[in-house]
Amino acid sequence: MIWYPFTLQFESDPPLKIKRAKGEFLYDENGNSYIDAVSSWWVSIHGHNHPKIIQAVKNQLNKLDHVLLAGFTHDPAEKLASELLKITDGLFHRVLYSDNGSTAVEIMIKLAYQYFQNTGETDRRTFIKFNASYHGDTIGAMSVGGNSVFNRVFQGLMFPTEEFLTPNCSFCPMKKSLTLATWNVWIQLKSFFKKILNPLRES
């Protein structure tokens, strides 16, 4: 009936049926409790059924359930944008909302690409990535992430990128310290940018 994510339908174990949640705990239909160690895929960072969040949602639903931000605006969206911009120390001046991380990555890929198209630098269309990175499961987000068992089958759909080793000493294939691993990645990046930028500088 339901196609659950990251599962093979013909060999997956039945999912655990959850009846309620509170704080960091999930409770199944038999009353057993489980720690939600992944925060339901990183979205319940304040715990489940937090009283302040529940009350804020109730208050908002009594006023306005939803309105698109294309030609419209509303106070909560503007207030949150203002608060977010305060913590950037003036580095940013606009907030673009997204409903999930993968879509946010897709938006930023498009923004970066469109910026250089609009400024006439149409050759600047190569994205770089670290080999062990993860940014989501949409096509663009997988393209700028590392190759894994979850996205390998979709390689033919992804756009080409330049990949560099992640400076992670715990899994460093060159057995280097953090300083040396970071320096090695920097050398790779510098070499790549020199290869890309030199022809532009000479033209």
Q: Can you describe what each PLM-predicted range is?
A:
Residues 17-19, 87-90, 119-121, 154-157, ...:
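Solvent-exposed alpha-helices and their adjacent loops that cap or buttress functional pockets
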Residues 23-25, 94, 126, 178:
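Conserved beta-strand and immediately adjacent loop positions that scaffold enzyme active sites
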Residues 28-29:
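Short, acidic, Ser/Thr-enriched surface-loop or helix-capping motifs
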